[in-house]
C-alpha cells in the first residue's frame, strides 16, 4: 500500500551537516556560491537525490513530514529555508524529545493512522520505538537515496 505520509529525520537522513548534527554547527549560516556554510566553514548539504525524492512525493500527492529531535529547532528551520526545501513539508515536528511524541502529534495533525505512515531515520533507537506505534520504519545508514525511498513506496 502506498503511504499517505512520508516522514524524514534530518541529520544523517536528509542532510549531512559536515559529519555531525545540525545543532553542533556554528551559526550564523551563509550561502557562498550556492553552498551553505556555518561560521567555521563547515558545509551542510542535502544527500544526492533528496530534491528528486521530494519532487516525486509532491507529484504523487503524498504528504511529507519531518520528525527531528534536534536541540536547536530554529537552526534546523533556518537550514531548511536556506536549502529551499521547507516548502515540501506539510508537517514539521522539530524539537528535542522522543520521536513517539513527534508521531503522536503527526497523527493528530494529519488525521492519519500510523499504518498510513512511513518513516526514514538513521538511528536504530528511533526506528525501534516508532515502529512499535505501527509506523513502517526504514533505517538508513548514510542518508536517503532515491532508490531506497522508491523501493518502499512501491512495495506492497
PLM feature spans:
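Asp-based phosphoryl-transfer active-site loop
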Residues: 2-19
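Conserved Rossmann-like nucleotide-cofactor binding loop
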Residues: 13, 20, 72, 125, ...
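Metal-dependent phosphoesterase signature
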Residues: 16-48
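Short, acidic loop-to-helix structural element flanking the phosphoryl-transfer center
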Residues: 35-65, 74-77, 97-101
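Short beta->alpha linker loops
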Residues: 49, 70-71, 97-98, 122, ...
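Surface-exposed amphipathic alpha-helices with a cationic face
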Residues: 54-59, 107, 127, 131
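Substrate-recognition "cap/lid" segment bordering the active-site pocket of phosphatases
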Residues: 67-118
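Acidic, Mg2+-coordinating phosphoryl-transfer loop and its flanking beta/alpha structural elements
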Residues: 114-155
Amino acid at each position: 500500500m502506498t503511504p499517505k505520509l512520508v516522514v524524514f529525520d534530518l541529520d544523517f537522513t536528509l542532510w549531512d551537516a559536515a559529519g555531525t548534527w545540525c545543532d553542533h554547527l556554528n551559526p550564523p549560516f551563509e550561502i557562498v556560491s550556492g553552498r551553505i556554510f556555518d561560521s567555521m566553514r563547515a558545509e551542510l548539504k542535502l544527500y544526492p537525490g533528496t530534491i528528486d525524492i521530494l519532487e516525486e512525493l509532491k507529484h504523487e500527492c503524498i504528504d511529507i513530514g519531518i520528525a527531528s529531535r534536534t536541540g536547536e529547532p530554529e537552526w534546523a528551520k533556518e537550514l531548511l529555508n536556506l536549502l529551499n526545501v521547507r516548502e515540501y513539508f506539510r508537517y514539521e515536528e522539530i524539537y528535542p524529545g522522543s520521536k513517539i511524541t513527534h508521531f503522536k502529534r503527526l497523527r493528530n495533525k494529519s488525521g492519519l493512522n500510523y499504518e498510513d505512515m512511513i518513516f526514514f531515520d538513521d538511528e536504530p533507537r528511533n526506528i525501534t520505538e516508532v515502529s512499535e506505534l505501527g509506523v513502517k520504519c526504514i533505517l538508513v545508514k548514510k542518508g536517503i537515496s532515491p532508490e531506497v525511498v522508491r523501493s518502499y513506496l512501491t512495495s506492497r
